[in-house]
Design a protein with these regions (language model features):
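Feature captures the catalytic ectodomains and active-site-proximal regions of enzymes
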Residues: 1-503
Length: 503
């Protein structure tokens, strides 16, 4: 007997904003979404700040969004958690940080601090780096090397020079730390097994190979002069003595896991085969749990369990579920949606569709959405699943390029695919929900007219297709309780989100 599915479609990076000449969402031709908004109950959801467990005014992101959606509650995020630890002093008593620094003192080796040099708050925060530098100074460490991954994506594409200058000033102020390398996140923070990029980052930090410039601020300025913005800056070695060597300690201060895994494995995994390199022992600290193996690493801030999230709860009831996305968002509909749990629950199937191998997604704004859609429709028609969680990556990933025309095409691609998935769901007698995890594509320009590549704090849509009802406004944490409500299921006590359906 076929199941009647409840399908959740997450349009990653699709926010709501007034029509404007830089709003790819309203510039795009979206006949499907226009019709869904006309025919079905819809509302708006908050996807940023305190409503998703971030500081007030902080833009949301895909990790946070999926964690809140899957958790059915506001999940306190790593950024405020670590920042509060700095304020109350517990940061400086952290066992993993102390172990890494004490090993340097014991072995006479160097400490390396690396991560995304930004105040964007999505993957890291520069204040956390400054706190680690103060801690190293207080412990009397002499050799502290800083490896800077420039952002240009969650902040302005040319803000990196200012961050590098601020870091250099902080080194002078504290009397600790030397900037050893500077590079764009494109190389150091890949997440799609583009090992040729990761190798360039690795070779700079470990072997001192790449472009050389003793002045890190000038190195960034020269990159700008060559029309290369922060994200794409090729690795530059600023201090040839600052390479990572045997028995050194490394602290990776990024707290978001997905873009921290590959360079970490290149350093710590003796069986790594992404490219040729030597393996050597280090005391390596991951700021959070980057993956479940914890291979040869310490974890500074272990993940707080999200008990009885939607995936775990559905499984406990003996229900079946499907998670489907392309590579760029696969971790979000699985690992993050499950509250940082790597394993599949009984009854949970997963489908991964490869993202296209292009340098930047403005070159192929359709990405792999059609294939994701095809496979999802096929699974819906199989009648095998009670719940389907689907992510279309286009609006976010193309929005990050800052190319408006491509973002418009991305929105139009998603519109078509959403229509097919909703139609297939309704034909099976099911209910489809269309939403987003945060904004992006609806705001593509800075006030000065330059490209805007970051997320927004805008509200996101929520459309309930197949159930005539009235909806209230809410937040992402209310989606899971709404799914359970339309399925006639009670929420587990751990979920403090509330159904969006007006009773």
């Amino acid at each position: 007997m076929n199941k009647t599915p409840t399908t959740l479609i997450i349009m990653d990076g699709f926010g709501i904003a007034p029509p404007a000449d830089d709003n790819a969402v309203t510039l795009a031709k979206t006949p499907v979404l226009d019709r869904l908004f006309q025919e079905y109950a819809h509302t708006t959801l908050s996807a940023s700040g305190l409503d998703v467990g971030l500081p007030a005014g902080q833009m949301g992101n895909s990790e946070v969004g999926h964690t809140n959606i899957g958790g059915g509650r506001v999940v306190f995020q790593d950024l405020p958690r670590i920042s509060r630890a700095i304020e109350d002093g517990s940061f400086f008593r952290n066992e993993a940080y102390n172990k890494a620094m004490d090993d340097c003192l014991k072995n006479g080796t160097a400490l390396h601090l690396y991560g995304l040099l930004s105040n964007g708050g999505v993957h890291s925060h520069i204040d956390h780096l400054y706190a680690l530098m103060r801690m190293a100074k207080d412990k009397g460490l002499q050799r502290v090397y800083l490896h800077c991954f420039l952002d240009g994506r969650d902040v302005s594409p040319t803000s990196g020079k200012g961050f590098v200058q601020a870091l250099a000033d902080k080194c002078a102020e504290l009397g600790v730390g030397k900037i050893a390398t500077v590079m764009g996140r494109y190389y150091a923070m890949d997440r799609d097994k583009r090992w040729e990029r990761v190798q360039m980052a690795y070779d700079a930090m470990v072997y001192g190979e790449g472009n050389h410039n003793p002045d890190p601020v000038d190195a960034v300025a020269q990159s700008y002069a060559a029309n290369v913005t922060d994200e794409f800056m090729e690795p530059v070695v600023c201090d040839s003595e600052g390479t990572i060597s045997d028995n050194d300690s490394v602290i990776f201060f990024n707290y978001r896991p997905d873009r921290a895994r590959e360079i970490t494995r290149a350093i710590v995994d003796p069986d790594f085969d992404g490219f040729q390199r030597e393996f050597f022992p280090t005391t390596y600290v991951c700021n959070t749990e980057y993956d479940a193996t914890r291979l040869n690493v310490l974890v500074a801030w272990p993940r707080i369990a999200v008990k009885n999230g939607l995936g775990e709860y559905l499984s406990s009831l003996g229900l079946t579920q499907l998670r489907i996305a392309e590579t760029e968002k696969y971790a979000h509909v699985t690992f993050f949606f499950n509250g940082g749990v790597e394993k599949q629950y009984p009854g949970e199937d997963r489908v991964l569709v490869a993202s296209p191998k292009v340098a930047t997604y403005d070159l192929q704004p359709e990405m792999s959405a059609v294939e994701v859609c095809d496979k999802c429709v096929e699974r819906i028609e199989s009648g095998a699943y009670d719940v389907i969680i689907l992510n279309f990556a286009n609006c976010d990933m193309v929005g990050h390029t800052g190319v408006l025309e491509a973002a418009v095409k991305a929105v139009e691609t998603v519109d078509t695919c959403v229509g097919r998935v909703v139609e297939a769901t309704l034909k099976m007698g099911g209910i489809a929900m269309v939403t987003a995890d945060h904004g992006n594509a609806e705001d593509m320009k800075q006030p000065d007219g330059s490209p805007m590549t970051s997320h927004t704090t805008n509200l996101v849509p929520f459309i309930l297709c197949g159930a005539g009802t009235e909806l209230r406004t809410g937040r992402l944490a209310d989606i899971a309780p709404t799914i359970l409500d339309v399925m006639g299921l009670a929420c587990p006590p751990e979920m403090d989100g509330k159904t969006l359906i007006v009773k």
